Every structure is written in C-alpha cells, then in structure tokens.
C-alpha cells in the first residue's frame, strides 16, 4: 500500500496517510459524536472502551470507508460498500467492507440496514468480541435496487452482551405478567 497525501479529495473527504486510515481508534468514553482533538475518529458515548476499526489485509486504505457516526444521537457506525452494485429481489449477497473490527470484551457488534435501506433489504450480522476477520454486510434483497461505491447502507451498533448463564429449575424463574404468551400475545 502506498502513502496517500494529506488534504481533501474531490468528494470533500479528508485524505489520511495509509497508516492513519489502516487503524483508527474510535474513542467512546466521552459522550459526544465529534472529531477528537487528535483526529483519531469519533466519540460515541455508548461504552467506556474503544471500538477499533482497521483496513483488512489485502485492501487498499484509499478504497475503504472508515465507519463514522453521522450525528451526536446516532446509535451506530455507518458501513459503506466498496463498489457499485445491482441487487435483484429474492437474492442474497455477501458484501465485503474491507474492514476488521475489535469489539471490546463484554460487547457485541450488530450489523443492521440503515433506516434508508430498510425498504430494500433485510440483514442482521453479529460481530463477536473475539472475531478479527473481514467484516461483510449480508443482504437479502426484498426489492430490486442499486448502490454506489462508498454508499452507506448498513450500520454497526455496539451494545453490551451477557455471556454468563446459570441453569436453574423452571419453577425458580421469576414470574411475569406476560407469562408464557408469545408470538403477538402482547398486542399488535
């Protein structure tokens, strides 16, 4: 990978050196979605640990969009596609992002469509805290549609995840008003 120059590209995005773009730490312990003073990324305020994104092996940092939080109240980091793509209703796709991620221990990353794309596809992805592979966006198209390179189509929400369990007799489970009702029993 070659060194990129600093400055602004033709799309209004700030270019970073390859080493800056390859590993960006999104510090999430200060509570607002603004650039940090050292331009390392965006602050989220969701958790006290950092969510770290890196350009995955074999991808050029210039081609990969590092995830961002769009506004101070955004719940997730926006994920982009690497190339123009056509989708056919009823088909399933696995889209590379060119990214790897380190989710803090005790948390899980959940990939979902951005609300603007919910009319086009359904998808859910789980990123475990110990996964260090290439992140993909799974798309099950519910309509014919197309996307452009670097278009933000999905989001990564990082949330706490309980992984400890205890097996107890059924009779000792706390009773609730809902009880055993499921599948629409709480109303439509």
From Swiss-Prot:
Residues 1-34 are annotated as: Disordered. The keyword Metal-binding applies. Disulfide bonds: none annotated. Its cofactor is Mg(2+). Keywords: Hydrolase, Magnesium, Metal-binding, Nucleotide metabolism. It comes from the Viruses. It catalyses: dUTP + H2O = dUMP + diphosphate + H(+). InterPro entries: dUTPase, dUTPase-like, dUTPase-like_sf, dUTPase_trimeric. Its EC number is 3.6.1.23. This enzyme is involved in nucleotide metabolism: it produces dUMP, the immediate precursor of thymidine nucleotides and it decreases the intracellular concentration of dUTP so that uracil cannot be incorporated into DNA. This is Deoxyuridine 5'-triphosphate nucleotidohydrolase.
């Amino acid at each position: 990978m070659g060194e990129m120059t600093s400055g602004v590209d033709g799309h209004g995005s700030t270019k970073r050196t390859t080493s800056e773009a390859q590993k960006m730490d999104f510090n999430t312990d200060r509570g607002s979605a603004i650039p940090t003073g050292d331009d390392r990324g965006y602050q989220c305020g969701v958790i006290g640990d950092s969510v770290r994104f890196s350009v995955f092996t074999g991808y050029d940092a210039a081609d990969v969009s590092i995830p961002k939080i769009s506004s101070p109240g955004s719940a997730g980091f926006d994920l982009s596609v690497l190339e123009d793509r056509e989708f056919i209703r009823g088909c399933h796709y696995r889209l590379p992002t060119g990214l790897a991620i380190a989710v803090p221990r005790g948390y899980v990353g959940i990939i979902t469509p951005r609300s603007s794309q919910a009319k086009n596809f359904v998808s859910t992805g789980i990123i475990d805290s110990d996964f260090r592979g290439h992140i993909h966006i799974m798309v099950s198209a519910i309509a014919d549609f197309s996307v452009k390179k670097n278009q933000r189509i999905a989001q990564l929400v990082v949330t706490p995840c309980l992984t400890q369990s205890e097996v107890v007799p059924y009779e000792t489970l706390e009773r609730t008003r809902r009880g055993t009702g499921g599948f629409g029993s709480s109303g439509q």
